[in-house]
Amino acid sequence: IFQMDMKGGQAESIYRAFGKVPVLTSPNMLLPFWFLEGLAVYYETRLTQAGRGRSSIYDMYLRTAALQDEFYTIDEISSQYLMESWPGLQAAYIYGVSLVTYIAGIYGEEALWGLSRAFSETPLLGFGGVLEDCLGVTLGQLWGDWQAWLKEKMLSQGEAIVRQGLVDGEQITRRGFRV
């Protein structure tokens, strides 16, 4: 909620003149879905003893994507449309927290707020433009760097799991993930 209500530049001027007009005075609600939800899950994890960022299930989804080299695209996790394959809309949360954690780890946690602040001041640049201005990388570069980092991390995790011994599961339905 905090990052969505940031305002600067023209949005702040409009707010002072007309009050809260959601899209005009809260431009961060237009941030990519993965960044909005990734930031929320990142802080949910960082500021509590729980948090989905520590979830072994999230790790499993990302490990599977990394080891099979079958990632969702950045477009798919940036919007809120219904995705027909598992894990559906949860992909924005799962990928988002991993991407946000990567950004904080590589560029520093202050970069997260810098991106939110910069987007609130210049939303017409789009997230890609703000990313380039703030971090000096394109969205495509960030996406590729994150995938390489994740593959390396998950390969190591996968090898450790294999050493412990795999457990075979049993498929109980063919109806898909909406059962």
Where are each of the predicted segments found?
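Beta-strand-rich domains and repeat architectures in extracellular enzymes and scaffolds
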Residues: V162-V179
